[in-house]
């Protein structure tokens, strides 16, 4: 796999969970002998939802809810077959979305 690069994007609502997952990925990759760039924190996506508090009237009384999506980027340079195998067996928490591009 010479000259290849694996790009991993992580998304989660909780920043502690995503940081812990990124740390585990970096530790696993460095143990197998590949080079790692990252984790790079990407901009946090913030969605704000405005909801009327009353079910019928009082339109002036509203409540705001927000949902933040934290993102991290990890690049693995010159991965070995052992690196790919260990990444496939890595067990990460349920709240983390992982996108892998070769």
Swiss-Prot record:
A family per Pfam: Ribosomal_S10
Role played: Involved in the binding of tRNA to the ribosomes.
Organism: Thermobifida fusca (strain YX)
Annotated TM spans: none
Protein name: Small ribosomal subunit protein uS10
Protein family (similarity comment): Belongs to the universal ribosomal protein uS10 family.
PANTHER family: 30S RIBOSOMAL PROTEIN S10 FAMILY MEMBER
UniProt xrefs under Gene3D superfamilies: Ribosomal protein S10 domain
Cellular component, GO, one term: ribosome
Gene Ontology BP, a term: translation
Source organism, top-level taxon: Bacteria
Entry-linked SMART domains: Ribosomal_S10
InterPro entries cross-referenced by the UniProt entry: Ribosomal_uS10 (IPR001848), Ribosomal_uS10_CS (IPR018268), Ribosomal_uS10_dom (IPR027486), Ribosomal_uS10_dom_sf (IPR036838)
Subunit structure of this chain's protein: Part of the 30S ribosomal subunit.
Keywords on record: Ribonucleoprotein, Ribosomal protein
GO MF annotation terms: structural constituent of ribosome; tRNA binding
Signal peptide location: none
